[in-house]
UniProtKB/Swiss-Prot annotation:
One of the protein's GO biological processes: translation
UniProt keyword terms in alphabetical order: Ribonucleoprotein, Ribosomal protein
PROSITE patterns: RIBOSOMAL_S2_1
Organism: Bordetella avium (strain 197N)
UniProt xrefs under Pfam families: Ribosomal_S2 (PF00318)
Family matches, as NCBIfam families: rpsB_bact
Protein name from the UniProt record: Small ribosomal subunit protein uS2
Length: 249
């Protein structure tokens, strides 16, 4: 099935009510039907391919992409696809300063990892009942807030965002730090601050699943390319080494 057909079936082309539109999205709008803007899927396909190409190249260089989707329709889909391709994700609330104040976030990650060790080695069982309850409450809170980024050792190399209106702070923080943003932008939002725009429906679960799967697939393809490149380098290196030995003999 062609990508455009998939997008059509997932309802990617359905924008928001015309009265809520953002004029900056005009280049990506085909028209309107029953007071709802219809997104030009030819534009979406081209922009989506640009975005996945960027992600693939970034992943091939060993880069990390932070998946961001905290609204109800996106949470589970974003977390599942990020985990599938081994990337960090934020599926609960975006904490202000998650990027711009990463030093503080790192100390929370350190605490979470220490707590996980306590659970793994059984030392948590030595706590009193009250301490145990407080411990579990803190662990749950940390897991919900930063569980998806606990293996992120530094700032990400890019952000993939579902719904820029919902994640204005995340996009603004990425802009401040010069981190490229790949984002799904619906007809009611501004594409400002987004480096790789995917014009499309940001409410439908089927549409969100399509975007998240596509970005995750691009990451996996890039990673595979990276591994193949390393294998080729090693093989070439071995051949050169053998030739040097032959010359010496």
């Amino acid at each position: 099935m062609s990508l455009m057909r998939e997008m059509l079936e997932a309802g990617v082309h359905f924008g928001h009510q015309t009265r809520y539109w953002n004029p900056k999205m005009a280049p990506y709008i085909f028209g309107h039907r029953n007071k709802i803007h219809i997104i030009n899927l030819e534009q979406t396909v081209a922009k989506y391919q640009e975005a996945t190409k960027f992600v693939k190249q970034l992943a091939a260089r060993g880069g990390n992409i932070l998946f961001v989707g905290t609204k109800r329709a996106a949470r589970e889909l974003v977390a599942t696809e990020a985990e599938r391709c081994g990337m960090p994700f934020v599926d609960a609330r975006w904490l202000g300063g998650m990027l711009t104040n990463f030093k503080t976030v790192k100390s929370s990650i350190k605490r979470l990892k220490e707590m996980e060790v306590m659970v793994a080695d059984g030392s948590v069982e030595r706590l009193t009942k009250k301490e145990g309850l407080l411990f579990q409450r803190e662990l749950d809170k940390l897991n919900k807030a930063i569980g998806g980024i606990k293996d992120m050792n530094g700032l990400p190399d890019a952000l993939f965002v579902i719904d820029v209106g919902y994640h204005k702070i995340a996009v603004a923080e990425a802009r401040t730090l010069g981190i490229p943003v790949v984002a799904v932008v619906d007809t009611n939002h501004s594409p400002d601050g987004v480096d790789y725009i995917i014009p499309g429906n940001d409410d439908s679960a089927r549409a969100i699943a399509l975007y998240a799967k596509g970005i995750a697939d691009a990451v996996l393809e890039g990673r595979e390319q990276n591994l193949n490149g390393l294998v080729e380098e090693i093989v070439e290196g071995e051949e050169e080494f053998v030739e040097v030995q032959d010359g010496q003999a």
